[in-house]
Amino acid sequence: MKYLITGLGNIGEEYRNTRHNIGFTVLDALAKASNLVFTDGRYGATATLSLKGRQLILLKPSTYMNLSGNAVRYWMQKENIPLENVLIVVDDLALPFGTLRLKGKGSDAGHNGLKHIAATLGTQDYARLRFGIGNDFPRGGQIDFVLGHFTDEDLKTMDERVATACDIIKSFCLAGISITMNQYNKK
């Protein structure tokens, strides 16, 4: 069985390790733990993780955030992956830093990457793992905040939160969304 795990982010060194790129950060950690290397391909860089008979296609789109749907649709079609086996890892301003929430569907919550994925796929009924980045910014400072780097305080627990996000991804693929939500959403 195949799964498409897409981490949202923007390409380019200037965006590396920014809050908006937490999706890339999580997938990098998942790949590194299994000694996988991403290979550049159409619409993004991919790595394939084998996990107990399942194939997880890890995708970091090269389309920029607000065109992420093109990459998701292409890889779903190329790998013949059904919508229920798609998981998007995304930053979330509405959640305190490090809070992780798995959802089976929902609104885009103003996130342009999710908005484009929903428009491209014609539905909002796809799973997403929201990684809280907090919202400690002044009025009108949202763009600078999401494109900024994590604070020293955030970095103290970053590795542990990213590791938990990786565990959630694996559980999503092995145990399913309901069990995974019940296990992790209360933490």
UniProtKB/Swiss-Prot annotation:
Catalysed reaction equations from the record: an N-acyl-L-alpha-aminoacyl-tRNA + H2O = an N-acyl-L-amino acid + a tRNA + H(+)
Any single GO BP term: rescue of stalled ribosome
Residues the record marks as active site: H20
GO cellular component, one term: cytoplasm
Cross-referenced Gene3D superfamilies: Peptidyl-tRNA hydrolase (3.40.50.1470)
Residues that bind tRNA: Y15, Y64, N66, N112
UniProt function note: Hydrolyzes ribosome-free peptidyl-tRNAs (with 1 or more amino acids incorporated), which drop off the ribosome during protein synthesis, or as a result of ribosome stalling. Catalyzes the release of premature peptidyl moieties from peptidyl-tRNA molecules trapped in stalled 50S ribosomal subunits, and thus maintains levels of free tRNAs and 50S ribosomes.
Protein name as it appears in the record: Peptidyl-tRNA hydrolase
Source species: Phocaeicola vulgatus (strain ATCC 8482 / DSM 1447 / JCM 5826 / CCUG 4940 / NBRC 14291 / NCTC 11154) (Bacteroides vulgatus)
Highest classification ranks of the organism: Bacteria, Pseudomonadati, Bacteroidota, Bacteroidia, Bacteroidales
